[in-house]
Amino acid sequence: MTRLDSVERAVADIAAGKAVIVIDDEDRENEGDLIFAAEKATPEMVAFMVRYTSGYLCVPLDGAICDRLGLLPMYAVNQDKHGTAYTVTVDARNGVGTGISASDRATTMRLLADPTSIAEDFTRPGHVVPLRAKDGGVLRRPGHTEAAVDLARMAGLQPAGAICEIVSQKDEGSMAQTDELRVFADEHDLAMITIADLIEWRRKHEKHIERIAEARIPTRHGEFRAIGYTSIYEEVEHVALVRGEIAGPNSDGDDVLVRVHSECLTGDVFGSRRCDCGPQLDAAMAMVAREGRGIVLYMRGHEGRGIGLMHKLQAYQLQDAGEDTVDANLKLGFPADARDYGIGAQILVDLGVRSMRLLTNNPAKRVGLDGYGLHIIERVPLPVRANAENIRYLMTKRDKMGHDLAGLDDFHESVHLPGEFGGAL
C-alpha cells in the first residue's frame, strides 16, 4: 500500500507556502494534482508546476470570490463529466506582460486571492483558469477544486488555490499514478494525501448538517423513527427512516442495512411505471423492517438524478420522442447523473453508521458514499420490477450506467413494446 502523509502536515505545508500532492478516488479521475495556495504563488512555484504537470494551470476559488470578481461560467451549461466548474479565463490587468510567463501567472494567481481585488483588475480572456468550488468543499464534491480551497482555508489563508495534474515521467502522454507520485513526492519533499483523507479529517472536525426533529412513523412495514435533517449549504430537507438501534449501548454502528433513496415524486408518490423507484423504496423499507435494524435515507433534491422535477418532465418529453434516459439528460445539457451524496454521507455518520450493507443496484452510489469515509462491506441488490413501460429505461441504466440488473433480456423478449417510450430518471 502506498505511503501517505497526514492532513496536518499538508495543511502546515500549504500555510508555509509549499506545494502538496492530492490524489482523488481511483474510480474518478485517479490522478494526483500539485496544489499550493494562490496567495503564496511565486514565479519559481509556477515554473515548477509547469515543468511537472500538464501545464493547464487552474485557480480554484470560493464561490464568494467568483461572485465578487464577476467570474462567469466558461459555458452556460456545464458538460464536464466530473462537473468541474470552469470560469472565463483571466490575466492580471497590470504588472504583467503577455500573461503566459511563470511570473505573469503567479501575479494573476496572487491577485485572484487578494481580498481587495475587483473585477476590473483582470482582463478576459487570459492565461489562468479560475474554477468555482462547490460550497461545502470536499464534503459536497470530492474533487481537486474543492480540496485546494479547503486546504487553503484550513491553513488560515484566503480560500484560493492553484492546481494542475502531474504527468508521468515514465510513460509519456499519461498521467502519473499513485506509486510514481509517491516517488515524486519524496524526491521533492512534498506531502501527499488523498481527497478521502481530507474528507475524513473534515468529517471529524466539522459538521454541516443539523438534526431538526424526530417522530414515530407507523407504516405498513411496521414502525420507523423519522429523523429530519437540514443542511447549511442547501435549502433542502432530508429524512431518515430508522429501524432499531444503529449505535448505542447495544450496537456499534457496524453492519447496518442502508438504503440511500433519491427522491422521485412521479414514482414514489404517483406510482409511475416509467421507473422502478417506487418499488425500490417499498422493497427497501420491507427489507429493513425484516432485518429489524437499518436505515432508509430519503434524499430530497435528487429528483431526476439531480436535475429537478421540471427538467425531468422535459426529459420525459424527449424520451417519448425516442431518446433514452441518458441521452435525454445530455440533450438538456445535464450530466447523466448529477446527484451528490455528500450530505447523505454526513447524515449516516450522524446516525452512528460506521460500516454498512448498501441496498442498491447502482455501483456509482457505492463509490459516491465510499469516498466519504463510510465503509461499505457489501452491496445488496434490490429486486428488479420490470414492466412494458420501464424495460427500455432499465436496459439503458444497465448498458450505459453500469447498473447491476439481471434478467432484463428475458423480459424484453417476452413483451410487446409500445413504441419508443422512456423511463424515469
UniProtKB/Swiss-Prot annotation:
Q: Where is this region: GTP cyclohydrolase II?
A: 205-425
Q: In which pathway does it act?
A: Cofactor biosynthesis; riboflavin biosynthesis; 2-hydroxy-3-oxobutyl phosphate from D-ribulose 5-phosphate: step 1/1; Cofactor biosynthesis; riboflavin biosynthesis; 5-amino-6-(D-ribitylamino)uracil from GTP: step 1/4
The entry marks the following residues as binding Mg(2+) 2, namely: E29, H144
Q: Which Pfam families match?
A: DHBP_synthase (PF00926), GTP_cyclohydro2 (PF00925)
Which sites bind GTP?
Answer: R259, V260, H261, S262, E263, Q280, E303, G304, R305, T325, T360, K365
Question: What EC number(s) is this enzyme filed under?
Answer: 4.1.99.12, 3.5.4.25
Amino-acid positions noted as binding D-ribulose 5-phosphate in the UniProt annotation, renumbered to this chain? R28, E29, D33, R141, P142, G143, H144, T145, E165
Q: Which cofactor does it need?
A: Mg(2+); Mn(2+); Zn(2+)
Q: Quote the catalytic residue positions.
A: D337 (proton acceptor), R339 (nucleophile)
Q: Which GO terms describe its cellular component?
A: cytosol
Q: How is the cofactor bound?
A: Binds 2 divalent metal cations per subunit. Magnesium or manganese.
Residues that hold Zn(2+) according to the record: C264, C275, C277
What are the boundaries of the region DHBP synthase? 1-204
Q: Name one GO molecular function term.
A: 3,4-dihydroxy-2-butanone-4-phosphate synthase activity
The entry's keywords: GTP-binding, Hydrolase, Lyase, Magnesium, Manganese, Metal-binding, Multifunctional enzyme, Nucleotide-binding, Riboflavin biosynthesis, Zinc
Q: PANTHER family under this entry? A: 3,4-DIHYDROXY-2-BUTANONE 4-PHOSPHATE SYNTHASE, GTP CYCLOHYDROLASE II-RELATED
Tell me the NCBIfam families matching this sequence: PRK00393.1, PRK09311.1, ribA, ribB
Protein task: Catalyzes the conversion of D-ribulose 5-phosphate to formate and 3,4-dihydroxy-2-butanone 4-phosphate.
The name under which this protein is listed is Riboflavin biosynthesis protein RibBA
Gene name as annotated: ribBA
